[in-house]
């Protein structure tokens, strides 16, 4: 079951006068600023969140949740015309062509100087090119991080996967770990990208979900430190929610979090969930 669910995984403020990322590695979240509701919404829309992999099953949900919460969004896609059929018209949504494999310079131009945060929800689709996972999940993510640094982006959120470090966890014979790595060592590629992010200096949150489900959310989010979970599943809707909350909660800074959903888990605020995980 875990194998089939993980196979479907496609790897996909606070906008105030202050910055997410400062010299002491801290940022002031949008929710910490005392504003009237209308003022807060206007403040959010002064900057954009760039979403890479915006038409993927998880990326699309991230875009929709950002828009529903009043964010302005720049959706990075490989086929703009096709993407236009995936989203409803929204004055806060800008669809732009972006291919993470084309290098950081082009990506920096697309991200622009009006994107204050970037969420990466890219992921390869199984095909004949066994190097695709490395082109997208490793080098593509690295390109995106370098582009963010060029543009001074203040927050980077990566949607990754549990079991990326399965070998070190003693899970090398885990069926899901074996199966996903059949496709060009996908999890190994993701892990290398994570290592680069940690050394980049950018304020990051790496979200590692369990097996992804397209069903409506059930249960409550369980959040654990990196290299803890080796089974379990979670709705893509909840993954998108966690990715957005990573922008809003200062407790998410410089952390790798693993998430699944469990019916028996208590309901906890995202502030508490992120605070419960030790950072870098």
UniProtKB/Swiss-Prot annotation:
Q: Which UniProt keywords apply?
A: Chloroplast, Plastid, Transit peptide
Does Plastid appear among the keywords?
yes
Q: Which GO terms describe its cellular component?
A: chloroplast; chloroplast envelope; chloroplast thylakoid; chloroplast thylakoid membrane; endoplasmic reticulum; plastoglobule
Q: What Gene3D superfamilies would the database entry show?
A: NAD(P)-binding Rossmann-like Domain
User: Major location, coarse class?
Assistant: plastid
The record ties this protein, via InterPro entries, to: NAD(P)-bd_dom, NAD(P)-bd_dom_sf
Keyword Repressor assigned: no
Transit peptide, residues from-to? 1-51
Localization recorded for this chain is: Plastid, Chloroplast, Plastoglobule
One Pfam entry for this protein is NAD_binding_10
Give the PANTHER family listed for this entry. FLAVIN REDUCTASE-RELATED, OS06G0360300 PROTEIN
**Annotated family:** Belongs to the NAD(P)-dependent epimerase/dehydratase family.
Its name, as the record gives it, is Uncharacterized protein At2g34460, chloroplastic
